[in-house]
């Protein structure tokens, strides 16, 4: 079934929509959630919440890229669950990925946090547009999908060391760009 047909099922409020969505994009959403939470039960619960979130979001939304839409909802829910401390077991992959980016991101703080988060997201998106396909792939798989570095390297067809060095250079470029734009002080 095509994404457009699945979206049409959501607009018709057909319960078949969730089954078709899970069949087509469930593995991608599960991978995102599992990489963040690390626990099978938490992953299953978060996926159930994801399907409900998509059900509530379509309509009114009609996403152009359904898999990205689903993975974004899944990632946001998994991140909230992770930070709320409800994950019973954490394997540290998500913490490690966030620690790698710590020098590139402004400190959280106070009233400005919400505004600076939007500004930061826009700056990172502009930065990603400047990267080569390979560097953007590495960055997104490591920091958006929270994939382990050996997995990202294998997916990119390069050695662990090469991937690690390239990601380090990308983080340095990101830090420089954020400093230049005044997002990181």
Predicted regions and their residues:
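Arg/Lys-rich amphipathic alpha helix in sigma70-family domain 2
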Residues: 72-94, 117, 180
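Pre-recognition alpha-helix immediately N-terminal to the DNA-recognition helix
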Residues: 16-17, 28, 123-126, 133-137
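Short helix-capping/turn signature of helix-turn-helix
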Residues: 24-26, 36, 140-148
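DNA-recognition helix of helix-turn-helix
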Residues: 65, 79, 124, 135, ...
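Acidic, proline/glycine-rich intrinsically disordered inter-domain spacer in sigma factors
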Residues: 100-129
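Structural recognition of an alpha-helix C-terminal capping motif at a helix-to-coil junction
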Residues: 45-52, 56, 64-76
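A short, charge-rich alpha-helical start-of-domain segment used by transcription regulators
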Residues: 7-31
């Amino acid at each position: 079934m095509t994404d457009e047909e699945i979206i049409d099922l959501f607009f018709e409020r057909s319960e078949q929509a969730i089954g078709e969505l899970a069949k087509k994009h469930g593995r991608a959403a599960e991978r995102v959630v599992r990489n963040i939470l690390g626990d099978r039960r938490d992953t299953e619960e978060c996926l159930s919440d994801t399907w409900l979130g998509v059900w509530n979001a379509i309509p009114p939304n009609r996403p152009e890229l359904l898999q990205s839409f689903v993975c974004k909802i899944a990632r946001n829910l998994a991140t909230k669950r992770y930070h709320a401390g409800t994950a019973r077991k954490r394997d540290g992959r998500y913490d490690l990925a966030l620690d790698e980016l710590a020098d590139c991101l402004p400190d959280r703080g106070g009233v400005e946090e919400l505004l600076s988060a939007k500004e930061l997201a826009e700056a990172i998106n502009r930065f990603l547009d400047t990267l080569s396909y390979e560097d953007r792939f590495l960055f997104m798989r490591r920091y958006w999908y929270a994939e382990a570095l050996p997995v990202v390297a294998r997916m990119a067809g390069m050695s662990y060391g090469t991937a690690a060095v390239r990601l380090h250079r990308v983080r340095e470029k990101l830090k420089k760009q954020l400093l230049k734009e005044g997002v990181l002080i």
